[in-house]
Curated annotation (Swiss-Prot):
This is Protein NrdI. The gene is nrdI. InterPro entries: Flavoprotein-like_sf, RNR_Ib_NrdI_bac, RNR_NrdI. SUPFAM superfamilies: Flavoproteins. Probably involved in ribonucleotide reductase function. It comes from the Bacteria.
Length: 134
């Protein structure tokens, strides 16, 4: 199965969610300038949403840098976003922004650490997505 690629800040919320998935995953480094992740296969991106409900600053800078690499952008096949429902329409907005800009499907959104149901939905959805791609 193709990997997930994710970013998680020092809060580790997204990291903990990805660990629960028990799927192959690679992490975008927090200190992006010191170590670079370069993808060589198609992947699905899992990204937290920042910015407190605003589109400005919603996509973490490390993710922007990662996707600014043409090779990484070329292998992106879909996006999943974490967010906070307190932000209303901006809940998981980083996923909306990336999906639109990179022209890939926005596959799922979950709140903060995600629920047991979110984990099951993402695991099943990712598996089905890759089966349809192959």
């Amino acid at each position: 199965m193709n990997p997930l690629v994710y970013f998680s800040s020092s809060s580790e919320n997204t990291h903990r969610f990805v660990e629960k998935l028990s799927l192959p995953a690679m992490r975008i480094p927090i200190a992006g300038a010191r170590s670079k992740l370069l993808m060589e296969t198609p992947y699905i991106l899992i990204v937290p949403s920042y910015g407190g409900g605003s589109a400005v600053g919603a996509v973490p800078i490390q993710v922007i840098r990662f996707l600014n690499d043409p090779q990484n952008r070329a292998f992106l096949r879909g996006v999943i976003a974490a967010g906070n429902t307190n932000f209303g329409a901006a809940y998981g907005i980083a996923g909306d922004i990336i999906a639109k800009k990179c022209q890939v499907p926005f596959l799922y959104r979950f709140e903060l650490l995600g629920t047991t149901q979110d984990v099951a939905n993402v695991r099943q959805g990712v598996t089905a997505f890759w089966q349809r791609q192959n």
